[in-house]
Amino acid sequence: MNSNVENLPPHIIRLVYKEVTTLTADPPDGIKVFPNEEDLTDLQVTIEGPEGTPYAGGLFRMKLLLGKDFPASPPKGYFLTKIFHPNVGPNGEICVNVLKRDWTAELGIRHVLLTIKCLLIHPNPESALNEEAGRLLLENYEEYAARARLLTEIHGGACSTSSGRAEATQDLASGASASSADPMIPGVLGGAEGPMAKKHAGERDKKLAAKKKLDKKRALRRL
């Protein structure tokens, strides 16, 4: 992809350079930014999978591409690490409102990165690019979480050890290419601890309580 630096006005280049420099020195928690010295509009990023989610323990590579109309138009975000998530398409494209209709020129790169990290905590199945992940999130959270964890272990496992984490960040710093896109692997059974898991567990508990109450009434009628 060609660089858009030459298409950006000098004052925008200065603003981007300033924010990227700040992000590199003082990144948000769990996020690291690796500027491309040859192309400021192509930002390489790693995001640690948030605790309490199926992505915990994973290290996810992504990139932000700033277009020639930035900041009037939002950047485009792509996961380079394979991930099972409703709002991430087959090519890694990220679907989140801040990168579309909610974007304003006043929002910065830091805000975008924090929003993407939050998307790992609270996926939005209503705007799914991965329809299977969106359906499982709504209908069978355990299966969704198992699939997400499995791909996290396979493709995002660099975060499991300090040496693996260092190796992954070194790859990005040296301009390593995206990880290969292996096909989705069927999930295994298992639960998960996190906000979405608790929500679905609560719904199941209500259904079980209602069923027990109905069974008790039927038993009393037979007496």
UniProtKB/Swiss-Prot annotation:
Superkingdom, taxonomy of origin: Eukaryota
Record keyword Nucleotide-binding present: yes
EC number(s) from the headed UniProt entry: 2.3.2.23
GO biological process, one term: protein K27-linked ubiquitination
Originating organism: Mus musculus (Mouse)
Descriptive protein name: Ubiquitin-conjugating enzyme E2 S
Function (record text): Accepts ubiquitin from the E1 complex and catalyzes its covalent attachment to other proteins. Catalyzes 'Lys-11'-linked polyubiquitination. Acts as an essential factor of the anaphase promoting complex/cyclosome (APC/C), a cell cycle-regulated ubiquitin ligase that controls progression through mitosis. Acts by specifically elongating 'Lys-11'-linked polyubiquitin chains initiated by the E2 enzyme UBE2C/UBCH10 on APC/C substrates, enhancing the degradation of APC/C substrates by the proteasome and promoting mitotic exit.
Keywords: Acetylation, ATP-binding, Cell cycle, Cell division, Nucleotide-binding, Phosphoprotein, Transferase, Ubl conjugation, Ubl conjugation pathway
Residue numbers of Phosphoserine PTMs: S174
Comp. bias intervals (Basic residues): 209-223
Keyword Cell cycle: yes
Residues modified to N-acetylmethionine: M1
